[in-house]
Amino acid sequence: LHVSGKGLNSPKQRPQLIKVKATMYDLQGKEVWKKAASAHLPSDSTVNCFEALSPDTTKSFMLRLEAVSELNNEILSTNTYFLWSNESSKELASVDIAKVDVNIMHKPTIQVVLTNTSDTPAMMIRLNLCGTDGEQILPVKYSDNYFHLLPGERKTISINWKPFDARGTNPQLKISGYNVKEIVK
C-alpha cells in the first residue's frame, strides 16, 4: 500500500480481496484519524483503495497502512510513512526516546521479539547481525527490517544466516532506531 491510496499486486500473486486500513498518529503515538475500505486486487495490477490523503501540513504525522486478507484475516502488508511540511519536520528532533525490549530465542533460526514498552512510537528500527569483530555478517535474511513500533506494539522477526559467514566470531544482534538507543544482544 502507498500513501497515495493505491494498492498493488504482483504478477506472481493470485487476485485477492483485501481490507485496507489507514490510521494516522501524532508523533506521540495517539490515533488522530482512521479509515477502512475493501478492495479487489487482480494479479499484476494497481488499484485505488481510497482517496489520497491530504493531512494538516502544519504538523507531523505517522501514517500506518495495512492490507489484510478478507479470506483469513492475515496481515499481507504493513507500511508506515511520515508526513510533514518543511516547517513541521523539526518536530521529529523533539520526539522522546522510546524503550524497546528485546527477547531472542534460538531455534533453527533466530526469533527476535521486540516490544515497544514506552508511550512514544519507536521509529525507524533496524536490526543488524554482526560478529564480535564488529563487522556485519552477510548474507542475512530478515523477515522484516527497518520498521516502526507504536506504543505497546510487539513484532517478531526471523533471522536466517549460515554460521560459516560469521568468520569464526560469535554473532551479536544490534538493534537501533531514530529514537531508540542502540541495543546489542
Map each language-model feature to its residues.
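Generic low-polarity alpha-helical segments
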Residues: 1-5, 140-141, 149
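Beta-strand-rich binding/interaction modules
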Residues: 1-40, 48-49, 59-70, 114-115, ...
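Low-complexity, acidic Ser/Thr/Pro/Gly-rich terminal tails and inter-domain linkers that flank the onset
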Residues: 2-4, 81-107
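Sterically constrained small-residue positions within well-ordered secondary structures
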Residues: 11-13, 54-56, 103, 118, ...
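Beta-strand-rich interaction surfaces with strong enrichment in secreted/lumenal proteins
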Residues: 35-41, 50-54, 101, 143-149
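Terminal connector regions
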Residues: 40, 46-94, 138, 156-185
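Solvent-exposed, conformationally flexible loop/turn segments
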Residues: 42-47, 105-107, 151-154
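C-terminal accessory/binding modules appended to enzymatic or scaffolding proteins
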Residues: 96-147, 157-160
